[in-house]
Swiss-Prot record:
Keywords: Membrane, Transmembrane, Transmembrane helix. The keyword Metal-binding does not apply. GO terms for molecular function: peptidyl-prolyl cis-trans isomerase activity. Its main location: membrane. InterPro entries: PPIase_dom_sf. This is Uncharacterized protein BB_0039. It comes from the Bacteria. It comes from Borreliella burgdorferi (strain ATCC 35210 / DSM 4680 / CIP 102532 / B31) (Borrelia burgdorferi). It is a single-pass membrane protein. GO terms for cellular component: membrane.
Length: 500
């Protein structure tokens, strides 16, 4: 009896223990379910931010702009950014970020529009065509440019799917472009007009003034009106990466530590290890680098041998201490060096001053021509006329351009507007372009022989249209009502100048 009761008791203990284990596992399972279905989906939003899930691309009204990593848009941004970097180099006044982002956005919009067309017209690709193109995918090619099964097998399933999807999309988009081009049907009258345009010529004379024609007298006059900008001082400086180092160095200078010794200790400038190098600096030079105007004025109040307090560099958390190796020199109108520095300043920061002067000079020339012979006025202003032949090859490369020295204007709508807006034996207004100011005179309107016209084939015109209209496809898809206007704007030369 005791054995039975002990067994029952033991069984109850085991059962209770099992129930406890089941209860604990049940609670654990419940926690996992709650975590998996409720909390986990929220975690990316809780812990992730734009820095970890996307790429920063500039800002708008102080708010950062982010876009998804590895997306097609990101690929376009990267492509156009690299392209701008190569083309522009270190060119100033070019917002590379904005231009790259804008072009990437337009390309992305074009892709969306193409995709809609693909769906609307049920475009498809044959398996044979797709496989043929996949075999040429760069990811699968060896160093000789041949398909490599080894490289194919090395690619992950994810990579293969991505390559496949990209290939399908690219081929479909190519087919859409062919579809659009084949549906842009041009009337024969358009081809005839382009052929007739090949015979149109404008024979012009022109003269020009460049920045080099901005006289020293004008340079001196500008400097004397802005004397403060062109004060000059011989300076050496030590750059510090933080304010603490700058203060420590300044205290040492106050305690008679030689400036040269501190330069060797703190400066990253290798030249300072050979001794302090002093350079002549103009007020406008330092105005570009010093953050506060009062600091700038304090530098130009230094006497020879004196040093400044730590001065913050503009747009950086760095500081400089300057030492004067001369007293301040005012602008000297007899100094070629000072005159050259002022002229360089005006060319760089105030080009409108030069252009305004040159425009006024050519306007005076036009005024004198009304009352004197052309040869006399040319001699008075020490100018000479050059000649050019202008034809209508703007934006349409179906026949050769006739421009020579003015070839830089071969795609300038403003230039063509002026030339084809002139009447025979009349002068244009001053025209500013490329650091020069021009005057154009229309000698005559002539027609070339029909030989060139007869050599132009419709197929060549169509080929050029298909190339040139690629930029109009988006407009065609998104703004059909504006297509005609956009077309005429892009093909400026299609205006019927032959009737003028």
């Amino acid at each position: 009896m005791r054995k039975r009761s002990r067994k029952v008791k033991n069984d109850l203990v085991v059962l209770e223990s099992k129930e406890k284990k089941v209860g604990m596992w049940g609670i654990f399972a419940l926690i996992l379910i709650v975590f998996g279905f409720i909390i986990a989906p929220l975690l990316p939003g809780i812990f992730d931010n734009a820095h970890s899930s996307g790429l920063k691309f500039g800002s708008y009204k102080g708010q950062p702009i982010y876009y998804k990593k590895d997306s097609k848009f990101a690929k376009y941004v990267n492509y156009y950014s690299n392209l701008y970097s190569r083309l522009q180099g270190n060119a100033k006044n070019i917002n590379t970020d904005y231009n790259a982002w804008y072009l990437a956005f337009m390309k992305y919009v074009e892709d969306v529009a193409f995709l809609d067309l693909v769906k609307k017209y049920n475009f498809y690709i044959s398996k044979e065509m797709l496989n043929k193109n996949l075999l040429k995918s760069p990811e699968y090619l060896d160093s000789s440019g041949n398909f490599s099964s080894k490289r194919y097998n090395k690619a992950s399933d994810y990579q293969k799917v991505k390559i496949y999807d990209d290939m399908v999309e690219n081929i479909l988009f190519s087919n859409v472009k062919i579809f659009l081009n084949s549906n842009l049907i041009f009337p024969d009258s358009l081809f005839d007009m382009i052929k007739n345009m090949s015979t149109v010529e404008r024979h012009i004379s022109y003269l020009s003034l460049s920045y080099q024609d901005f006289s020293n007298k004008e340079v001196i006059s500008y400097a004397e009106k802005n004397l403060n900008l062109f004060k000059r001082l011989s300076l050496a400086s030590i750059r510090f990466k933080n304010m603490n180092d700058a203060r420590t160095a300044h205290d040492k200078l106050l305690n008679k530590t030689p400036f040269e010794e501190l330069a060797k200790l703190y400066s990253d400038d290798i030249a300072n290890f050979k001794g302090v190098v002093s350079l002549d600096k103009y007020y406008f030079d330092l105005d570009l680098n010093v953050e506060k105007k009062e600091d700038l004025n304090s530098i130009f109040s230094l006497r020879e041998g004196e040093f400044s307090k730590p001065i913050k560099i503009k747009n950086k958390n760095e500081y400089q201490i300057y030492k004067a190796f001369s007293n301040v020199h005012d602008f000297d109108k007899n100094s070629d060096r000072d005159i050259s520095s002022v002229k360089n300043y005006i060319e760089t920061y105030e080009p409108s001053v030069i252009e305004g002067y040159l425009e006024n000079k050519l306007s005076d020339f036009l005024g004198d021509v009304k009352f004197s012979s052309l040869s006399q006025v040319l001699e008075k202003y020490q100018l000479s006329l050059k000649e050019e032949i202008v034809n209508l090859s703007y934006n349409i490369n179906v026949y050769p351009n006739t421009l020579k020295e003015l070839v830089e204007f071969n795609n300038s709508k403003s230039f063509y507007d002026i030339i084809f807006g002139l009447k025979e034996n009349s002068w244009s207004k001053p025209f500013v372009a490329n650091k020069k100011v021009y005057l154009f005179f229309l000698n005559s309107v002539k027609k070339r022989s029909n030989q060139l016209k007869d050599e132009i084939k419709n197929e060549k015109i169509l080929d050029n249209f298909n190339i040139a209209n690629s930029g109009l496809i988006t407009d065609f898809l998104l703004n059909k009502k504006d297509f005609v206007n956009n077309f005429n704007e892009s093909f400026f030369a299609l205006q019927n100048f032959s009737q003028n």
